[in-house]
Curated annotation (Swiss-Prot):
It is found in: Cell inner membrane. The keyword Zinc-finger does not apply. The lineage of its organism: Bacteria, Pseudomonadati, Pseudomonadota, Gammaproteobacteria, Enterobacterales. The chain crosses the membrane at residues 30-50, 57-77, 109-129. It comes from Shigella flexneri. The keyword Transmembrane helix applies. Part of an enzyme complex containing four subunits: a flavoprotein (FrdA), an iron-sulfur protein (FrdB), and two hydrophobic anchor proteins (FrdC and FrdD). This is Fumarate reductase subunit C. It is a multi-pass membrane protein. NCBIfam families: PRK04987.1. It comes from the Bacteria. InterPro entries: Fumarate_red_C, SQR/QFR_C/D.
Length: 131
């Protein structure tokens, strides 16, 4: 059965998400995928440069020393840290840890995740720089 009644469709602008801070932050957090793609492409180029010998690697290092690339990589690092922060804040909501019949708060989980991240970073830097 068809009807001739026209349903009401509420108008919505394409910038509706800019009105609420929650949605603005959500879009910013989801936008961290773009710098992650940049870093992935950069890493692939690094692997090819490493495979093609010392001259190609030296060219890649020269590319990385370009001030524009340094700024883009700093933006990428900032985006990765923001994504990590929001992910670590989400982790306690997925884990129900009960100690002595009480649910553990999110702070110990978040702090332990950051501690593991810092330790892993220090170990990787030590191996990369001094091994």
């Amino acid at each position: 059965m068809t009807t001739k009644r026209k349903p009401y469709v509420r108008p919505m602008t394409s910038t509706w998400w800019k009105k609420l801070p929650f949605y603005r932050f959500y879009m910013l957090r989801e936008g961290t995928a773009v710098p992650a793609v940049w870093f992935s492409i950069e890493l692939i180029f690094a692997l090819f440069a490493l495979k093609n010998g010392p001259e190609a690697w030296a060219g890649f290092v020269d590319f990385l020393q370009n001030p524009v690339i340094v700024i883009i990589n700093l933006i990428t690092l900032t985006a990765a840290l923001l994504h990590t922060k929001t992910w670590f804040e989400l982790a306690p909501k997925a884990a129900n840890i009960i100690v002595k019949d009480e649910k553990m708060g999110p702070e110990p989980i978040i702090k332990s995740l950051w501690a593991v991240t810092v330790v892993a970073t220090i170990v990787i830097l030590f191996v990369a720089l001094y091994w």
